[in-house]
């Protein structure tokens, strides 16, 4: 089975979950004994302030408090910018809309996603999303909370500096930490070593990690993921006679999640009579459509990306190649024994079993063991929640004062 290498329990974090700082009360005082004046500190009333964990993904930004088992908020990573030509003179409405602000607006909007294949390309939009998270979604004062931010594999090092500039300069947070998404994912499995196979909405990675050290020189990347699978499903449905457009992608996304799966043996599925495959799906307007082989054919692009026009290898091939590169460094056996699936795209029904089968065929002598945690869709955020809760981690927060004194060196020395 794909899950024979069962994920470890998360365990109990040391210290107070998510405690990033405290605020003392004002009732400390002096007692005069007559013979001598002694400093007597009464027990201080302390308000614990939890750290905030933010995982900015290509489809959603997941956020919540450290110490929680799952994120509390899922904010769309797509923002809406008002078209300048549609604004009247003296119009004081917000120029950028985020989250629920995008609903029920009659103003023409240009939809923008600040990430392209997992890499930030529009920092102004990132700032708008974070502003919405702090002020509207979580309703907190950012200057009262430390923040842990995830960073994609192979992203430019300048990303971490930009995160710090925004968090400290714009939002005035007291402390922050930036760390690898892959490292956080492996923590969600209760491990520090393994081969993280991540596939979200905009990009896929295969990342070897040994004893908490990410190995970027051995990391693989593919510019296809869940969003491409959705587009391919729309192509297949249109070839079957439907007329979906990009305006219907949210509907296609829902069809993918509710109706589609990865076939263990696709050639056997192709041999089934149509009635065994067909399911009806009701569109928002009440119209019923019937979906047949498209249900499993769409997921084949993860194994054969050429079906969707990509020249990159499939996810199992990408993983096998990464395992091969681990041979020279002596990590191969450890990596093969701990192949960890992460990200929303891997949540497709049947994907773990099919991935295990394909990887075993590509690496017959390595006995790869694939693990698929039930909550792997939010593995990055969950790992961040665990990390920010550990007592041993508290010394790795970069304070605002440190950043002001040392600049980027403060970030690189702790993150």
Swiss-Prot record:
Gene3D superfamilies cross-referenced by the UniProt entry: 3.30.420.40, Actin, Chain A, domain 4
Signal peptide annotation: none
Main location: cytoplasm
Keywords for this protein: Cytoplasm, Cytoskeleton, Phosphoprotein
Residue span of region Disordered: 1-35
GO cellular component: cytoplasm; cytoskeleton
Modified residues (Phosphoserine): 6
Pfam families according to UniProt: Actin
Protein's cellular compartments: Cytoplasm, Cytoskeleton
Positions in coiled-coil regions: none
Similarity field: Belongs to the actin family.
PANTHER family associated with the record: ACTIN
Name by which UniProt lists this protein: Actin-like protein 7B
């Amino acid at each position: 089975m794909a899950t024979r290498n069962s994920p470890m329990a998360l365990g109990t974090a040391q210290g107070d979950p998510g405690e990033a700082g405290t605020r003392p009360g004002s009732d400390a005082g002096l007692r005069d004994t007559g013979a001598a004046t002694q400093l007597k500190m009464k027990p201080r009333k302390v308000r614990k302030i939890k750290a905030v964990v933010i995982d900015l993904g290509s489809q959603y930004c997941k956020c919540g408090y450290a110490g929680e088992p799952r994120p509390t908020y899922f904010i769309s990573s797509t923002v809406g910018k008002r078209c300048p030509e549609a604004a009247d003179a003296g119009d004081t409405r917000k120029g950028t809309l985020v989250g629920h602000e995008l609903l029920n607006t009659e103003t023409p909007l240009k939809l923008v996603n600040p990430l392209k294949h997992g890499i930030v390309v529009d920092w102004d939009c990132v700032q708008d999303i974070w502003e919405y998270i702090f002020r509207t979604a979580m309703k907190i004062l950012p200057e009262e909370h430390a923040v842990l931010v995830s960073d994609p594999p192979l992203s430019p090092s300048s990303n971490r500096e930009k995160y710090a500039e925004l968090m400290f300069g714009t939002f005035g947070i007291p402390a922050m930490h930036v760390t690898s998404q892959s490292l956080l994912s492996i923590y969600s499995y209760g491990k520090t070593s393994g081969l993280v196979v991540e596939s979200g909405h905009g990009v896929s990675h295969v990342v070897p990690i040994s004893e908490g050290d990410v190995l970027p020189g051995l990391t693989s990347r593919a510019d296809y993921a869940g969003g491409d699978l959705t587009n391919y499903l729309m192509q297949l449905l249109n070839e079957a006679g439907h007329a979906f457009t990009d305006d219907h992608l949210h509907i296609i996304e829902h069809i993918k999640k509710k109706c589609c799966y990865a076939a263990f043996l696709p050639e056997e599925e192709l041999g089934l009579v149509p009635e065994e495959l067909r399911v009806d799906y009701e569109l928002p307007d009440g119209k019923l459509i019937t979906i047949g082989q498209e249900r499993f054919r769409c997921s084949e692009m993860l194994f054969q990306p050429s079906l969707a026009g990509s020249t990159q290898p499939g996810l199992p091939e990408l993983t096998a190649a990464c395992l091969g590169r681990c041979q020279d460094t002596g990590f191969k056996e450890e990596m093969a024994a701990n192949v960890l699936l992460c990200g929303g795209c891997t949540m497709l029904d049947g994907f773990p079993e099919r991935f295990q089968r394909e990887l075993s065929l590509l690496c017959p002598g390595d006995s790869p063991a694939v693990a698929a945690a039930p909550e792997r869709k939010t593995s990055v955020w969950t790992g961040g929640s665990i990390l920010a809760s550990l007592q041993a981690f508290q010394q790795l927060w970069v304070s605002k004062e440190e950043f002001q004194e040392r600049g980027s060196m403060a970030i690189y020395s702790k993150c």
